[in-house]
Amino acid sequence: MICSDKVHEILYGGDYNPEQWGEEERQKDMQYLPEAGVNIVTLNVFNWGMLQPDEEHYDFSELDETVQMVTDKGMKICMATATAAHPAWMAHRYPDILRTEFSGMKRKYGARHNSCPNSDTFHKYATRLAAKLAERYQNQDNIVAWHIGNEYGGICYCENCEKAFRIWLQKKYGSIEKLNQVWNTHFWGHTFYDWDEIVAPNLLTEHFENNRSMYPCITLDYYRFQSDSMLQNFIDESAEIRKIIPDAKITTNLMGFYKELDYGKWAKYMDFVSWDNYPNAGEPEAMIAMKHDLMRGLKPGMPFSLMEQTPSVSNWHNYATLKRPGEMRLMSYQAMAHGADTIMFFQMRQCKAECEKLHSAFISHVGTNNTRIYKECQALGKELQSLGSEIPGSLVHAKAAILFDWNNWWAI
């Protein structure tokens, strides 16, 4: 839950990317979204390249227009820091920012989740952008939450990470002798005499398959280290925002049973837990329920936010199945029944092009409010409005619990 005196109702809305569209479409959005009961939009998730054209210059003019546009319609804002995908110029000039895959392949610019979490370049510019956003919008009263990054993930195996891994190990074990003892390095002659001899465990070193390590002790510590590295990115951006907005409510969107990150540890640094629910077609309802319960349990005594779900089709599943009439409503209420008091979607208007152009939205490529999906979203929005202020912040005390631990998961 966004514990804020600015929030007194169930928040309903989702990701909005008007920079992909022209003025005519934006004006229609500002009619259709409020009519659907939308009272919050997430802005600026992937705008880093638009906001920062080079090392020293920033351009917030288009974001300013969007903020004003949704504010005029009475909507609240979840403001993202845009650091989920670095700009092309940054990768070109500072290749240390590029992530290395498990195979040892060094990435070039492209896609997203392509930043090394231990790159000095990434840290410098990401924290600077977070600070500039906080400074610019600190007095924007309808910003009720700040969204760091997006769906953190993507383990890196580059030289930046190897160097940082050695420092992390020194802090954990204190001496190389202690590390040798804990890692049982007498096995297969792995005794280390210098920290610089330690390398990242991947297909080039200790693995013969993705989940099959010949030295599980090394791999387990590397998982811990990478989770901590990405968490530090989150913490550092959060700190820049809090310097300017001490009472900011800060989160990032988690992904259920996502193995790469220790969400139990992450949740301690999040003001409220939010997550993205994208079940596969035919996924058992009990598994979806368990994911909701996992998210609810990360911060005991608090509801969580459903940050993303799809109104109908997910573009990236093996089978792009339409949700049946009423299914989106059912899944939204399932989330609420398990502790959500924020129901949000990806996204408000369907992408103009590229890989998510077939991912559904409130407003489809037809561009009108006369579609089944829009009408279902509108009906749900009206229902949520009728619930008033009774549900946000409410709790149900569980009589049973399931223990789930990422370290055990990694070790299996």
Segments predicted by a language model, with ranges:
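The substrate-binding groove and active-site-proximal loops of carbohydrate-active enzymes
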Residues: 11-23, 44-63, 108-127, 149-156, ...
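Short, well-ordered coil/turn segments that N-cap beta-strands
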Residues: 7-12, 37-39, 71-77, 139-144, ...
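Short, acidic/polar
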Residues: 20-35, 126-133, 253-266, 324-332
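Aromatic-lined substrate-binding rim segments of carbohydrate-active enzymes
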Residues: 27-107, 131-134, 234-244
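Polysaccharide-binding and catalytic clefts of secreted carbohydrate-active enzymes
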Residues: 104-272, 276-290
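Conserved, mostly hydrophobic/aromatic
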Residues: 14, 33, 41, 70, ...
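Carbohydrate-binding surfaces of carbohydrate-active enzymes
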Residues: 198, 202, 247, 256, ...
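An acidic-aromatic substrate-binding cleft motif
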Residues: 1-40
